[in-house]
Amino acid sequence: MATVNKAHLEFCSSPEWARLVEDELLPWVLDGCELGDDLLEVGPGPGLTTDVLRGRTARVTAVELDLDLAGKLAARLAGSNVRVIAGDVTRLPFPAGRFSAAACLTMLHHIPSPALQDAALAELARVLRPGGVLAGSDGLDTPARRELHVGDVFVPVDPGTLEGRLRTAGFGRARVDVAGDRVRFAATR
């Protein structure tokens, strides 16, 4: 089941996006976040974020809803420190406290309702170890972003409510920052 249109997927697979991820997005999002040795990444899409994350921790488990994207990413990263699973972030197949950290990068807006977004946040809190951090980012609602998402799922996250939503999901401390047309968040279980 695809949650992105063709143009969006092409951009998220492009060298331009890879450069933005490595040089700007991940340094900003991960600033001050300790990933530990066992990272869960949800919604990696074609995996350009995964490519950077796998160099920052011993193990990465990537959960992707789209079966085709999950299969391609698993094939591309076979033999690496990344395990790719096709699955739903609102129903993760892992025991409580399994991961040292989680990354949720530019994907929350692809979850089709705030209630399901909250279910995803609660699942992420559940599978994190005590003291584990969720590091994430998302794009704000802009005309350009709406245009990029024509024909796919786009439910923007309100940064004004995100800290409270993270706490309700089971996180103790939460930080939310807005810069330009992006929001980053870090929450500790």
Where are these regions (language model features)?
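C-terminal alpha-helical "lid/dimerization" subdomain adjacent to the S-adenosyl-L-methionine
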Residues: 12-13, 17-18, 133-186
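Short glycine-centered segments of the SAM/dcSAM-binding site in methyltransferase folds
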Residues: 38, 132-133
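Class I SAM-dependent methyltransferase SAM/SAH-binding core
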Residues: 40, 45-91
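Short catalytic micro-motifs in class I SAM-dependent methyltransferases
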Residues: 106-110
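A conserved beta-strand element that flanks and buttresses the S-adenosyl-L-methionine
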Residues: 103
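A short glycine-rich, Lys/Arg-flanked "PGG" loop and its adjoining helix->strand segment in the class I
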Residues: 118-130
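Conserved alpha-helix/loop element of class I SAM-dependent methyltransferases that forms part
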Residues: 18-37
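N-terminal, positively charged/glycine-rich alpha-helical extensions of SAM-dependent methyltransferases
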Residues: 1-9
